[in-house]
From Swiss-Prot:
Cofactor note: Binds 1 zinc ion per subunit.
Enzyme class: hydrolase
Protein's recorded name: Snake venom metalloproteinase bothrolysin
Keyword check for Hydrolase: yes
Organism from which the protein derives: Bothrops jararaca (Jararaca)
Function, in words: Snake venom zinc metalloproteinase that impairs hemostasis in the envenomed animal.
């Protein structure tokens, strides 16, 4: 369903953002 696809895309965006933030903090340390 379109709603399910939208939810997956949102999850991927959030997951990617958290991953980049984690990498930034790790690299900073």
């Amino acid at each position: 369903t379109p709603e399910h696809q939208r939810y997956i895309e949102l999850f991927l965006v959030v997951d990617s953002g958290m991953f980049m933030k984690y990498n930034g903090n790790s690299d900073k340390i």
